[in-house]
Amino acid sequence: MLNYELELWEKGLLVAGVDEAGRGPLAGPVVAAAVILPPFTEPFIKGDSKKLTKKEREEAYEEIKNKALAVGTAVVDSAVIDRVNILRATKLAMKRALKDLKYHYDIVITDYVKLEGENCMPLVKGDEKSLNCACASIIAKVIRDKIMEIYHKIYPDFNFASNKGYPSKTHLEKVEKGEYTEIHRKSFSPLKKKLF
């Protein structure tokens, strides 16, 4: 998980890892996080956010915040996603997360998203190959999950605490009936089919 960082750290470069959570759901924001770990940090997490349980993610979240030189986050809501499309919204969130770092970095490693205007290394499965990127994936996922738990209290019928806005069977059934909320992405199928 450190091959790319070690090579960059040996050159004296500070690495920022960036990843997002929430590109695929039908509802809710896309959240990005950027993390800069001290050079030569040994791996201290079991993997990226997808490989951890909720409890493990929350524990890792606290550990990352304690170990990192800097952590930046950004949230882009569903209205912006509908206006600019999910890829542009993801890049916008990532760039805002980098700006939120308020810390110098030399290169950015992403999970296969090229960020224009940045010295960027987009890696296929970057969240599995880069420790900084894996840490960013955990931060983004924990924050997005907390946001969706708040939305669950506002829209309990959609069970956002469980499905996090992803198209579960019951969530899809509600959408197929024409039911949706303010946080649903109207530009995403099947909502787009129902609305236009």
Swiss-Prot record:
Needed cofactors: Mn(2+); Mg(2+)
Key words of the record: Cytoplasm, Endonuclease, Hydrolase, Manganese, Metal-binding, Nuclease
Gene3D superfamilies for the chain: Ribonuclease H-like superfamily/Ribonuclease H
Location of this chain's protein in the cell: Cytoplasm
Keyword Hydrolase: yes
Record text on cofactor binding: Manganese or magnesium. Binds 1 divalent metal ion per monomer in the absence of substrate. May bind a second metal ion after substrate binding.
Residues the entry annotates as binding a divalent metal cation: D19, E20, D111
Highest rank taxon of the organism: Bacteria
Entry GO terms, CC: cytoplasm; ribonuclease H2 complex
One Pfam family per UniProt: RNase_HII
Function description: Endonuclease that specifically degrades the RNA of RNA-DNA hybrids.
NCBIfam families registered for this protein in UniProt: PRK00015.1-3
Protein name as it appears in the record: Ribonuclease HII
Lineage, opening ranks: Bacteria, Pseudomonadati, Aquificota, Aquificia, Aquificales
Gene name of this polypeptide: rnhB
